[in-house]
């Protein structure tokens, strides 16, 4: 009976050690996060006019399908867009100032809406026989790092279709 009790006590001590070590590490991570957040809230507004804004090449889209998707696409294309995927709000505040966070988030949301809407619009273009216009838009989206499986699949199907025709 004594060896089992000794093993159990040693197990509890080791477990307690690892739990405390994990708590200390977690507390350190939290303290670093809140310190970074505190610093980011003190950053003044910086110029964002020179950022790499995404501009959809509307002049290369000659088609007028007169659909609600197309109307939404063209309305969205007029709005400023930035691909800020993977950048935290804290990092945005540190880099561009707290006052710019709301507008940068809006520009990022415009880009996210563009990525979500593009596959539907490209599908409508393909169905209307405008495969080259659809391909150009899909390639443009890939070029601005629009990470979407739907875009990739549509572009792949267009590539497969064109290679099978040749």
Region spans (language model):
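Alpha-helical solenoid scaffolds that mediate protein-protein interactions
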Residues: 141-142
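Alpha-helical linker/edge segments of TPR/alpha-solenoid repeat scaffolds
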Residues: 93-97, 159-166
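Residue at a conserved register position within TPR or TPR-like alpha-solenoid repeats
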Residues: 124-125, 158-159
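N-terminal alpha-helical interaction modules that lie
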Residues: 2-113
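TPR repeat positional signature
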Residues: 117-118, 152
């Amino acid at each position: 009976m004594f060896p089992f009790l000794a093993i159990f006590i040693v197990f509890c001590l080791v477990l307690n050690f690892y739990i405390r070590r994990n708590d200390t590490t977690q507390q350190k991570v939290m303290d670093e996060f809140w310190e970074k957040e505190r610093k980011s809230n003190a950053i003044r507004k910086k110029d964002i006019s020179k950022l790499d804004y995404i501009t959809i090449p509307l002049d290369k889209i000659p088609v007028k399908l007169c659909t609600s998707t197309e109307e939404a696409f063209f309305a969205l294309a007029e709005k400023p867009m930035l691909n800020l995927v993977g950048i935290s709000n804290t990092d945005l505040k540190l880099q561009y100032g707290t006052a710019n966070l709301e507008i940068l988030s809006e520009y990022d949301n415009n880009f996210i809406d563009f990525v979500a809407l593009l596959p539907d619009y490209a599908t409508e273009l393909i169905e209307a026989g405008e495969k080259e216009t659809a391909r150009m838009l899909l390639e443009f989206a890939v070029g601005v790092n629009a990470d979407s499986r739907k875009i990739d699949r549509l572009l792949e199907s267009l590539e497969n279709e064109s290679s099978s025709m040749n």
